[in-house]
UniProtKB/Swiss-Prot annotation:
The lineage of its organism: Bacteria, Pseudomonadati, Pseudomonadota, Betaproteobacteria, Burkholderiales. This is Dihydroorotate dehydrogenase (quinone). The gene is pyrD. One of its GO terms (biological process) is 'de novo' pyrimidine nucleobase biosynthetic process. Its EC number is 1.3.5.2. Keywords: Cell membrane, Flavoprotein, FMN, Membrane, Oxidoreductase, Pyrimidine biosynthesis. It comes from Methylibium petroleiphilum (strain ATCC BAA-1232 / LMG 22953 / PM1). Pathway: Pyrimidine metabolism; UMP biosynthesis via de novo pathway; orotate from (S)-dihydroorotate (quinone route): step 1/1. Monomer. One of its GO terms (cellular component) is cytoplasm. Substrate binds at residues 69, 114-118, 178, 183, 252-253. The active site is at residue 181.
Amino acid sequence: MPLIPYALTRPFLFGLDAEHAHELTLASIARLQNTPLQCLWQQPRIDDPVTLAGVRFPNRIGLAAGLDKNGRCIDGFGAMGFGFIEVGTVTPKGQPGNPKPRIFRLPQAEALINRLGFNNDGLDAFLANVRRAGFRQGGGVLGLNIGKNAATPIEDAVDDYLLGLEGVYPHADYVTVNISSPNTQNLRSLQSDAALDALLGRLQERRQQLIARHGRSVPMFVKIAPDLDEAQVDVIAATLKKNAVDGVIATNTTLSRDAVRGQAHATEVGGLSGRPVFEASNRVVGQLRAALGAGYPIIGVGGVMSGADARAKRDVGADVVQIYTGLIYRGPALVSEAARALKG
């Protein structure tokens, strides 16, 4: 158990502006990771190994991308017991993201709305942080999530993804291609049939070159949205298989507000995460499993607020599970709770 129960620190954090609390938490973890004070949140990693896409995951619970966009706190989050950690989304050039305020809590629904817009320090700073981290050397799996700059026209998006893939490839256990954030204009259009096929074709061509150059095969995952109908999911699944993509992450945040109507901040623009996205995410995971068949790697994410939620996501077809908003509402104890629920 962490030395300081999260129930004692959450009221203080929730009394702050949501983004300020987020930045304060990251700054504290970055400062204290790999020091004796890491014991404040440290807990043992549950041992439950599973191999996906040729990568051995020490357990089935991971941190979703977006919480640590610049990879500043990899070892600190690793100390919470995660088997795998995904950092980013990183873009080739640093960018400030959308104007503040841009993160909103909906406590009644155990949810967040964000319209951050891929705010990050850029690829060079990101890779410097990744190189400093010892998480991989300790057996953890590190996923690096890449996206496009807001200033890059959508028709040139592939160039940004190629730059990202080139940069992160030597340092990643897997690479995630993020085409599903609702906060970068037109990004989700890359999920459409022809656009996705063209993007993945170019990325796989470059990946084969990188395999030859580095002498190792780093699997590539694609992260998709929950706001897709069954026909769209089937098209995406077929396109993933056609382009020999190693796995899929389902899902990102939702644009739907059906579950939070009438609540404070419910009308804010951005992606909704947390408990309200759980069912939509599980629906997409289940549809992907049916379309892709047994054995195709699926990382499930969206609305996991308890160990039972994590198990339910595995039961509908996810091989491993990620959390983000649940960590904000429940704290580090959720990591071990979910890992135990997913075991076996």
